[in-house]
Swiss-Prot record:
Assembly mode: Monomer.
Keyword Nucleotide-binding: yes
Domain of life, per lineage: Eukaryota
UniProt-annotated binding residues for AMP: 71, 76, 97-99, 126-129, 133, 201, 212
UniProt xrefs under HAMAP family: Adenylate_kinase_Adk, Adenylate_kinase_AK2
Main location (coarse class): cytoplasm
Gene: ADK1
Family membership noted in the UniProt record: Belongs to the adenylate kinase family. AK2 subfamily.
Name of the protein in its database record: Adenylate kinase
Organism (species): Pyricularia oryzae (strain 70-15 / ATCC MYA-4617 / FGSC 8958)
ATP-binding as UniProt keyword: yes
Start and end residues of each stretch annotated as NMP: 70-99
Residues annotated to bind ATP: 50-55, 168, 177-178, 240
Free-text comment about domains: Consists of three domains, a large central CORE domain and two small peripheral domains, NMPbind and LID, which undergo movements during catalysis. The LID domain closes over the site of phosphoryl transfer upon ATP binding. Assembling and dissambling the active center during each catalytic cycle provides an effective means to prevent ATP hydrolysis.
InterPro entries to which the protein is assigned, alphabetical: Adenyl_kin_sub, Adenylat/UMP-CMP_kin, Adenylat_kinase_CS, Adenylate_kinase_lid-dom, AK2, P-loop_NTPase
Amino acid sequence: MGAMEDQLQRLGSVLDSLDARVKKLEQHPTLGGGSSTAQEIRMILIGPPGAGKGTQAPKIKEKFSCCHLATGDMLRSQVAKKTPLGREAKKIMDQGGLVSDDIVIGMIKEELDTNVECKGGFILDGFPRTVPQAQSLDAMLQARNQKLQHAVELQIDDALLVARITGRLVHPASGRSYHTTFNPPKKAMTDDVTGEPLIQRSDDNADALKKRLATYHSQTAPVVDYYRKTGIWKPIDASQEPGTVWKSLLNIFDGDAKKASSAGGGILDKLAASGR
């Protein structure tokens, strides 16, 4: 009888131990590997200036509790903090040169390693702009046992972009963007969230925009083709209302890319009504 009780006690201890391990794994699903949770997002947002990246990225960030990595903001932040990469980048920029791909990849990696927000994933905005950059990004992520899930392209006609950008308003601190016609703030020239003043960028004029668009199209076509071949490229009609574009993004995240790419023309009606 005593031997039977001992066996039952040992069996109970084993079951308790297994139960504890199961609970621990449920609490930490990524233990023992680099795989992500179901809610983690890893994506790049492709689109010309004025396509709506600054409108949609904060919504994605809020939904997934992830970080929004805009290369320009990253560079300015690293330079301001005088990090080793920031000092190296500043030296190059002061000499009128272009910051190397290795430095930008290094900055992205540092953000992924140290930015708490990046634990929920990331949105890359403004990078990669070339196929070699895309390949370097893939290699860096592969070394972390990660890979991109989505390369979303916000597609829009150049003529509509001119109308959009010449009325664009920006909140400098957050990057939130508005438009006098398409997406006006609740109070004129005032950020909805902070109440701080909005600005209009000096390069948001038709002539400057045409040059930026020419550069964008020549650079981006090969990158889009690269991600199309990998199977993660998804197009969205960015001429639609911001709310409709957001629904298209949600469809992509839910796996319905066909529905996400459907056309809509609500924004064109606003354009005509505004007399632009």
